[in-house]
Design a protein with these regions (language model features):
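Conserved class I S-adenosyl-L-methionine
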Residues: 3-76, 178-204
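Class I SAM-dependent methyltransferase SAM/SAH-binding core
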Residues: 95-139
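A conserved beta-strand element that flanks and buttresses the S-adenosyl-L-methionine
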Residues: 154
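A short, conserved alpha-helix within the catalytic core of class I
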Residues: 160-172
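Conserved Class I S-adenosyl-L-methionine
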Residues: 227-314
């Protein structure tokens, strides 16, 4: 009798038969390229001239201190360590770091923001912070930011670039010991996800922190993630101002992803939602986050922005 040369396993399968092909996206997908594709549908990042104009409304004194304190606590910067603060703005991190004696290179692409920072440093007599006009896309080496040029590199709420991986790797290259960044967990710090949900809209853009984590892991790094909650108490003089503000938010968040009919239907729901959620602001006239007087109306529940704090050691 001739024995069958093909043997079956107890479950009836053939051990020498190829398994069904399977490609795990998590470990094979190019997350940076997908992130770039998403950017095509997002609102364009503000340029340097925009931030130059806004600089007058900013100041490190007016920075949200709970956010800054939490960032610095999580960063774990050691006494005397040097810091690269990329996208420093008016110095929300650079000023307290400089006041604590850290040598800081404070880089930003807005001369207006750096001007406010320089005034603050002069007023407080801080000499260990060096402002530097430099963008994410510039040749950092040409600006003196070389490999391992700082003990710690930070980018607080400032990664608004065309290439997420390139920005993350630039920070990694510049740091000797540690890198710390924050990215919004939602679509944008300008977006109130509650409003979008109430209007029947879904923001499919953003979630940059998930892409950053995946990119860093692909590069063999071990990112750690924590979260910082930051309140944004928006105020308005009139219901119409609130309507116009949130209409712009809708267009920025999902304008390229919905039809005109869907947009019009969402905005039709906005006025009733505002009627239910706008209240008299008990802090009207008092200094707000940026030092300007708060306006007459506010949302019943202030908007909250959740930031993902991502750090990795080298």
């Amino acid at each position: 009798m001739v024995e069958n040369s093909i043997h079956e396993t107890p479950d009836g399968s053939h051990p020498d038969k190829p398994a069904t092909a399977f490609t795990p996206l998590l470990t094979t997908h190019d997350w940076n390229e997908e992130w770039k594709e998403l950017q095509k549908a997002r609102r364009a990042a503000d340029d340097a001239s925009h931030w130059d104009k806004r600089a007058a409304t900013f100041g490190s004194k007016d920075a949200p201190n709970p956010y800054v304190e939490r960032f610095l606590d999580l960063a774990g910067i050691r006494p005397g360590e040097s810091v690269l603060d990329m996208g420093c703005g008016t110095g929300a991190l650079s000023v307290p770091l400089g006041a604590a004696g850290h040598p800081v290179v404070a880089a930003d692409f807005s001369q207006g923001m750096l001007g406010v920072l320089e005034d603050e440093l002069a007023e407080r007599g801080i000499v260990s912070v060096t402002p530097k006009l430099m963008s994410w896309e510039d040749d950092w080496a040409a600006h003196g930011v070389l490999h391992d040029s700082a003990d710690v590199a930070v980018a607080s709420r400032s990664i608004a670039t065309a290439d997420l991986k390139d920005s993350l790797m630039r920070l990694t290259d510049a740091a000797r010991r540690r890198v710390c960044i924050t990215l919004p967990t939602g679509g944008s710090p300008r977006t109130d996800e509650r409003v979008l949900t109430a209007l029947g809209l879904q923001n499919q853009l953003g979630r940059d922190y998930l892409y950053a984590f995946a990119i860093l892991a692909e590069e063999g790094l071990k990112p750690e993630v924590s979260y910082i909650e930051s309140a944004r108490p928006d105020t308005f003089d009139t219901p119409e101002e609130a309507y116009e503000t949130f209409s712009r938010m809708v267009d920025d968040a999902v304008g390229s992803l919905v039809t005109t009919a869907e947009r019009d239907a969402a905005l039709a729901r906005l006025r009733p939602w505002l009627a239910d959620n706008l209240v008299e602001n008990p802090r009207a006239g008092l200094p707000g986050r940026k030092g300007e007087p708060e306006k007459r109306l506010a949302l019943r529940e202030p908007r909250k922005v959740s930031w993902a704090f991502i750090a990795w050691d080298k």
